[in-house]
Amino acid sequence: MWVGIISLFPEMFRSVTDFGVTGQAVKKGLLSIETWNPRDFTHDKHRTVDDRPYGGGPGMLMMVQPLRDAIQTAKQAAPGKTKVIYLSPQGRKLDQQGVEELATNENLLLICGRYEGVDERIIQSEVDEEWSIGDFVMTGGELPAMTLIDSVSRFVPGVLGDFASAEEDSFANGLLDCPHYTRPEVLDDKDVPSVLKSGNHKDIRRWRLKQSLGRTWLRRPELLENLALTDEQEQLLAEFIKEQRS
């Protein structure tokens, strides 16, 4: 996967390219990340990248010319057809379904806004989709872009050692993840659930599904409203609720 980034602070993306799972993916050639700084496309000695908004009001907008030139240069450098995304509070909220949709693209170009945002005409002419990571305001689009890269890259073949990890994590099936345990067997007088030590894979699968359903019911009940539960899932959830209330 190729990811291009338009940002006034490209150095921030070293945390993606140099560390963790994404850093390893870059080293292996599974993920390619390139950055373009609009400051490099300015024509004045101050390298100005902001401008006043029409109509007045607080704050500034990103200057059109350097931003557009950076976007068009990045598009030309992309290895193929590229989806252009603007990280924006007005965009579609990123969720697991959205992550999986974005992961089907071989090339993504992410535009990170700053100040009060960008000229609406740039969005209309250069952007394919707007995406948000939540209903809150941040100082720029860099951290949302990193979030998107991290979540989407998990679905690039070879990035995770076990691809099933991406399919079984929280939200992959619309549910929160079940609890997990490792050694020691007893920690602060709390034992690992006996079913996980039983070796019975059928019982372990049912326990994990039950806990996943129950945790979703307890913490994010609104997620269940959008799911069509199977008969088995309905039964396991009913058992969990009964146990909680007994």
From Swiss-Prot:
Can the keyword Repeat be found in this entry's annotation?
no
Q: What does this protein do?
A: Specifically methylates guanosine-37 in various tRNAs.
Enzymatic reactions: guanosine(37) in tRNA + S-adenosyl-L-methionine = N(1)-methylguanosine(37) in tRNA + S-adenosyl-L-homocysteine + H(+)
Q: How does it assemble?
A: Homodimer.
Subcellular compartments:
Cytoplasm
Which GO MF term does the entry hold, naming one? tRNA (guanine(37)-N1)-methyltransferase activity
Which InterPro entries does the record cross-reference, listed alphabetically?
Answer: Alpha/beta_knot_MTases, tRNA_m1G_MeTrfase_C_sf, tRNA_m1G_MeTrfase_TrmD, tRNA_m1G_MTases_N, tRNA_MeTrfase_TRMD/TRM10
Q: Which BP terms does GO give this entry?
A: tRNA N1-guanine methylation
- Top-level lineage group: Bacteria
The EC number(s) attached to this protein equal 2.1.1.228
Question: Enzyme class, one word?
Answer: transferase
Name the record gives this protein:
tRNA (guanine-N(1)-)-methyltransferase
| Family note | Belongs to the RNA methyltransferase TrmD family.
Q: Which gene encodes it?
A: trmD
Keywords, in A-Z order: Cytoplasm, Methyltransferase, S-adenosyl-L-methionine, Transferase, tRNA processing
